[in-house]
């Protein structure tokens, strides 16, 4: 019978301590390399293509910077209102557009009013948006990342009446 470290046909190696040590080291090294390669492969494939943005009664987004991996085909943003006030008093939405378009999008959104979630449905500058949420509510939107051009700067804003000057954030493509 062949032992754990013994090669068939060479029983002398089974009792040589140096051979046993080297053989164990080689097997351990191969197992370690295989394990590390499998882990590295998992990291390369797994991308986080979603995020949650929190808003509150103090007119804040947290975080105010969203990193979107270039490998993501679609990206989902969930807006969670952690405050207590109802949406009629302190509603928030999340609207994505080019950074240079945010002020215009906020103006036309405010004019669109509450029944349109403060987003003009004809405004082609809007890339994606959530509905308006009040305290304890959340809303999600998934969008095609092909709409985002590398090298262009993007941001997000709350277009609820009066919120856009302070409720802003930036998108970083990485």
Spell out what each predicted region is.
Residues 20-32:
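Bacterial N-terminal signal peptides that target proteins for export
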Residues 65-89, 94-96, 140-149, 153-154, ...:
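Beta-strand cores of secreted/periplasmic/IMS beta-sandwich domains, seen most often
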Residues 47-56, 97-119, 161-174:
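Extracytoplasmic/periplasmic copper-protein system
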Residues 48-74:
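N-terminal edge beta-strand
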Residues 1-23:
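N-terminal amphipathic/basic-hydrophobic helices that include classical n-h-c signal peptides
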Residues 128-174:
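Extracellular/periplasmic metallocenter environments
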């Amino acid at each position: 019978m062949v032992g754990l470290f013994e090669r068939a046909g060479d029983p002398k190696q089974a009792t040589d301590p140096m051979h046993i040590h080297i053989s164990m080291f080689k097997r351990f090294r191969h197992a370690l390399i295989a394990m590390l390669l499998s882990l590295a492969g998992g990291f390369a494939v797994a991308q986080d293509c979603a995020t949650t943005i929190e808003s509150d009664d103090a007119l804040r987004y947290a975080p105010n910077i969203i990193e979107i991996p270039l490998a993501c085909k679609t990206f989902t943003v969930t807006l969670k209102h952690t405050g207590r006030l109802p949406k009629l008093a302190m509603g928030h939405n999340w609207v994505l557009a080019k950074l240079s378009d945010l002020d215009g999008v906020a103006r036309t959104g405010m004019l669109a009013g509450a029944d349109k979630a403060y987003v003009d449905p004809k405004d082609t500058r809007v890339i994606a948006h959530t509905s308006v949420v009040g305290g304890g509510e959340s809303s999600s939107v998934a969008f095609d990342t092909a709409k985002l051009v590398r090298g262009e700067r993007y941001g997000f804003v709350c277009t609820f009446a009066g919120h856009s000057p302070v409720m802003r954030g930036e998108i970083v493509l990485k």
